[in-house]
């Protein structure tokens, strides 16, 4: 499943295609959304927001389209009039004079009013988004030490969208490698230096992955491009200590780590 940086880049592409342009045609596959087709025609997409792995498409009339791709949903941008060659099932089409965005295969799609947006169950449940520029390391540290999260092993906590939205498996293993911690560690057991380092890295690595388009390159981690240090690198030498990277399963997901320097 795509993680926060990939979802945000997808939203950027959708925004670049249709933001601020009048919608010339709107189509929904689901019957409960059909009444909104006429309401949205002629309106503008004002912005596309991400909340972890959910997308919120905001319209100029105050409505918001909520969509969660889950495992199979995917958005596409095409030239208006183009007919894509795909076996996927179309769910949403938002068309402007020159560009059209299409949502395929997703099933978790709703139209929300401004009031419903504040009470939506998923949006109420997710934590702050790691790509939200207003989120600070100090706030992350406070969440780590909160009664709700301080006794949770990082192997599960860093996959829990209620803790921080937008994290996922590759971010989990890269974050823990960067600070030299294991999946069994808990926030309550860390010293002040470890807590401060983790609070910063929980934001730094997702943001680095997003801003550098997640490209793999020979540059160093804090250089121009993001590069995996342990993810999918089992059997290779750890660049920090020379130990051999191993693969196991934690919280039902593949977990990559260096036993020599992550202790």
UniProtKB/Swiss-Prot annotation:
Its cofactor is Zn(2+). The active site is at residues 2-3, 53, 253. Involved in base excision repair of DNA damaged by oxidation or by mutagenic agents. Acts as a DNA glycosylase that recognizes and removes damaged bases. Has a preference for oxidized pyrimidines, such as thymine glycol, 5,6-dihydrouracil and 5,6-dihydrothymine. Has AP (apurinic/apyrimidinic) lyase activity and introduces nicks in the DNA strand. Cleaves the DNA backbone by beta-delta elimination to generate a single-strand break at the site of the removed base with both 3'- and 5'-phosphates. Its EC number is 3.2.2.-, 4.2.99.18. PROSITE patterns: FPG_CAT (PS51068), ZF_FPG_1 (PS01242), ZF_FPG_2 (PS51066). GO terms for molecular function: class I DNA-(apurinic or apyrimidinic site) endonuclease activity; damaged DNA binding; oxidized pyrimidine nucleobase lesion DNA N-glycosylase activity; zinc ion binding. Binds 1 zinc ion per subunit. A zinc finger (FPG-type) spans 229-263. It catalyses: 2'-deoxyribonucleotide-(2'-deoxyribose 5'-phosphate)-2'-deoxyribonucleotide-DNA = a 3'-end 2'-deoxyribonucleotide-(2,3-dehydro-2,3-deoxyribose 5'-phosphate)-DNA + a 5'-end 5'-phospho-2'-deoxyribonucleoside-DNA + H(+). This is Endonuclease 8. Keywords: DNA damage, DNA repair, DNA-binding, Glycosidase, Hydrolase, Lyase, Metal-binding, Multifunctional enzyme, Zinc, Zinc-finger. DNA binds at residues 70, 125, 169. CDD domains: EcNei-like_N (cd08965). Coiled coil: none annotated. GO terms for biological process: base-excision repair. Belongs to the FPG family.
């Amino acid at each position: 499943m795509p993680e926060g940086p990939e979802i945000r880049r997808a939203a950027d592409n959708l925004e670049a295609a249709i933001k601020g342009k009048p919608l010339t045609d709107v189509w929904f596959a689901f019957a409960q959304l059909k009444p909104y087709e006429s309401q949205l025609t002629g309106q503008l997409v004002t912005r596309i927001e991400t909340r972890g792995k959910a997308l919120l498409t905001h319209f100029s009339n105050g409505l918001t389209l909520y969509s969660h791709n889950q495992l199979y949903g995917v958005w596409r941008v095409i030239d208006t009039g183009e007919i894509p060659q795909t076996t996927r099932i179309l769910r949403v089409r938002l068309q402007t004079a020159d560009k059209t965005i299409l949502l395929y295969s997703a099933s978790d799609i709703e139209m929300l009013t401004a009031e419903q947006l504040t009470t939506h169950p998923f949006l109420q449940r997710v934590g702050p988004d790691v790509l939200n520029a207003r989120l600070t390391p100090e706030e992350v540290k406070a969440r780590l030490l909160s009664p709700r999260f301080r006794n949770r092993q990082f192997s599960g906590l860093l996959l829990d969208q209620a803790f921080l939205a937008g994290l996922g498996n590759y971010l989990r293993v890269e974050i823990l490698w960067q600070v030299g911690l294991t999946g069994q560690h808990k926030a309550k057991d860390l010293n002040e230096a470890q807590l401060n380092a983790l609070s910063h890295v929980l934001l730094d690595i997702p943001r680095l992955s997003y801003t550098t388009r997640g490209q793999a390159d020979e540059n160093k981690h804090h250089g121009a491009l993001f590069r995996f240090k342990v993810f999918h690198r089992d059997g290779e030498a750890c660049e920090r200590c020379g130990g051999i990277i191993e693969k196991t399963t934690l919280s039902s997901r593949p977990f990559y780590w260096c036993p020599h320097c992550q202790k």
